[in-house]
Structure formats: C-alpha cells, structure tokens
C-alpha cells in the first residue's frame, strides 16, 4: 500500500488540516491520493466532519463509509466511544477498508485519532493500525511549549515498534507564539536525530492557509 499514516502528539494539533493539505498537494501533482479516517468521534452537527474534509480534499466520489467506517457521537477515543454505544471497532475491518481504497487509488493518507497510543479497539491502539497497514508515519505536533517532550515520546514509541517515521511537522494552530517556538525544532532534532520537516506558519484566512500548507508540505513530503 502506498501512502502515509498521519498521527499527532495530541488531539487538536492539526492532523486533519495537514492531511488535507497533503492530499491537495498530491492531487495537484497528478497523484490520485485519497484520505481515510478509520474512526471519528465527537462530530459537531452542522460542521464538516473530518471524513467529509478528507473526502473534499481528495476530490473523489467515495461514499463516506468508504472514507470512515466508524463514526461515534461522544468526543472520546474510538474504543471508549464505541463502548458507550454498545459497539466495537474491528482492526480487521479498518484494514479491509484501507486496502479497498488503495486498490481504487494510487495512494492513501490515513489520519488517526488523537495520538499514536490512543485506543482504536478494545485491544489495539493506532500504533497497531499503522503497523498493520505498513505505512510510514508522519508526526504532527504543536509548535509551542511542551512539544519537545510530546514529540520525542511519540518518535521513541514509533521506533520501539519498528515503525518507519516519515517525518515531523510542527504546526502553529493559533496566532500566539511563546518563546519556545523558534527553539523547538532544534531541540527536537537533537533529541530524536530527526530534523522537523517544517514549522508551519499561522494564517487566519482558511483558504490562504490551506494553500500555504499545501505548498510547503507538497515540496517536502513524498509518498
């Protein structure tokens, strides 16, 4: 399977935004890439869901169930949200859906929920899913204070499991910077021996930010 698995160091770090930018950049370069969200939870009615945003960025006509096989109401990790609804997430089912997408498209960008060790099923985490799919993992992290520890821990967890690290992206998710922001890329590189691919700029205009992220990431990430 050709593609990327996108994980985060936390929730709210911009995984969907980065995944959509990668998809748009890939399609602009002529690559038929499609997004996938194995499970989404806590969708706010009236707002586009992560799966809908990924499908739009993929510019495809896939049904939402083919993009996201599991949707839950509660804003919890997939395994916990499933328990509340008396349901179960099946790793085998998620892998089956991903492989079906891969058979119809040239590449798949799989966006996980939360971080790498967030429980996907009653027994497996998103790290297990990344391993089952055999995809390199792109780590999306916040740019500010605390990100050095979170990012280093995520990279260490990936390496201990023998999972390929596609890169690290530091994402500014708001206009405010703290004094650590310009220093964090070098600290992360020193601790992980991996130079972050990009420190993404903040841009309040959504359309302009999408174009900016696509341009930056498209030039630096190949899959």
UniProtKB/Swiss-Prot annotation:
Catalyzes what? (7R,8S)-7,8-diammoniononanoate + CO2 + ATP = (4R,5S)-dethiobiotin + ADP + phosphate + 3 H(+)
| Name of the protein described by the UniProt record | ATP-dependent dethiobiotin synthetase BioD
Gene name as annotated: bioD
Q: Which top EC class is named for this enzyme in its record?
A: ligase
Q: In which pathway does it act?
A: Cofactor biosynthesis; biotin biosynthesis; biotin from 7,8-diaminononanoate: step 1/2
Q: Where does substrate bind?
A: 41
Q: Which residues form the active site?
A: 37
Gene3D superfamilies to which the protein is assigned, alphabetical: P-loop containing nucleotide triphosphate hydrolases
Organism of this sequence: Anaeromyxobacter sp. (strain K)
Q: Where does ATP bind?
A: 50, 111-114, 171-172
Q: Which InterPro entries match?
A: DTB_synth_BioD, P-loop_NTPase
Against HAMAP family, the record matches this protein to: BioD
Record's subunit section: Homodimer.
Primary location recorded for the protein, binned into one broad class: cytoplasm
Q: What does this protein do?
A: Catalyzes a mechanistically unusual reaction, the ATP-dependent insertion of CO2 between the N7 and N8 nitrogen atoms of 7,8-diaminopelargonic acid (DAPA, also called 7,8-diammoniononanoate) to form a ureido ring.
User: Where is this gene product found?
Assistant: Cytoplasm
Q: Which cofactor does it need?
A: Mg(2+)
Recite the UniProt keywords alphabetically: ATP-binding, Biotin biosynthesis, Cytoplasm, Ligase, Magnesium, Metal-binding, Nucleotide-binding
Q: Which GO terms describe its biological process?
A: biotin biosynthetic process
Family label:
Belongs to the dethiobiotin synthetase family.
